[in-house]
Amino acid sequence: MNHFAKRIIPCLDVKDGRVVKGVNFVGLVDAGDPVEIAKRYNDEGADELCFLDITASHLGRDTIVDVVKKVASKLFIPLTVGGGIRTIDDISRLLNAGCDKVSLNSSAIKDPNLIDEAAKKFGSQCVVVAIDAKKIENGYSVFINGGRIDTKKDAFSWAKEVESRGAGEILLTSMDNDGVKQGFSLELTKIFSALSIPTIASGGAGKMEHFKDAFEVGADACLAASIFHFGEIEIKKLKEYLKANGVEVRL
């Protein structure tokens, strides 16, 4: 699907209220402070921000709500939070704390009705479903639990089901490309561009050209982590490059 301006979304891993795999910006007082980092991305021209809560314990659920409250008060761009969201109550607490969207992953596979319920109660615009796809012999399969469990579901069929249940957006990660910095999976992104809801491409960004390539095959947004966090690519420069190459972005 092709919508309006293309979006650039940095993603931060948060554990026990701290950003892990620290962010290496010049002049950060505290490389683990989600509020400081969020504010920096806001100022750098990110279109949205994504937090992945990797806190394992249930106690940690309260921590992410506190983080969201603090960050949302300083942030002027949409914030999505994913990781460990299992119930309507979890979603409600995060949205009330000030996040704009929630990202469902394993929980959507285990209980697909959660998508319908969340979309009905909060609106499709709040519901993102994350799909981690890995190439298999004859297509792509959906994996959960950090890529450890093969659900044996076809990724595109699942995406169509998710769309029909009311999800407003799909966060598509190519497990084969993730962390390799050789580019997003263009084949996978192109397949998903046939959906009528937006697709965020994730996994594999290494240089500016990779973003351009993903947008050209139909991604609506691109998400990346380390290349932004370690200053390998500055968002402002990336957007200028994209604009110069005919990709519509908000400068």
Curated annotation (Swiss-Prot):
Annotated HAMAP family: HisF
One GO CC annotation: cytoplasm
GO biological process: L-histidine biosynthetic process
Subunit structure: Heterodimer of HisH and HisF.
Organism: Campylobacter concisus (strain 13826)
InterPro entries with a match to the protein in the record: Aldolase_TIM, His_biosynth, HisF, IGPS_HisA/HisF, RibuloseP-bd_barrel
Identification of the protein by name: Imidazole glycerol phosphate synthase subunit HisF
A GO MF label: imidazoleglycerol-phosphate synthase activity
Recorded superkingdom: Bacteria
Keywords recorded for this protein, A-Z: Amino-acid biosynthesis, Cytoplasm, Histidine biosynthesis, Lyase
Main location: cytoplasm
Compartments in which it is found: Cytoplasm
Gene: hisF
General function of this protein: IGPS catalyzes the conversion of PRFAR and glutamine to IGP, AICAR and glutamate. The HisF subunit catalyzes the cyclization activity that produces IGP and AICAR from PRFAR using the ammonia provided by the HisH subunit.
Enzyme Commission code(s) on record: 4.3.2.10
Pathway assigned in UniProt: Amino-acid biosynthesis; L-histidine biosynthesis; L-histidine from 5-phospho-alpha-D-ribose 1-diphosphate: step 5/9
Catalytic activity as recorded in UniProt: 5-[(5-phospho-1-deoxy-D-ribulos-1-ylimino)methylamino]-1-(5-phospho-beta-D-ribosyl)imidazole-4-carboxamide + L-glutamine = D-erythro-1-(imidazol-4-yl)glycerol 3-phosphate + 5-amino-1-(5-phospho-beta-D-ribosyl)imidazole-4-carboxamide + L-glutamate + H(+)
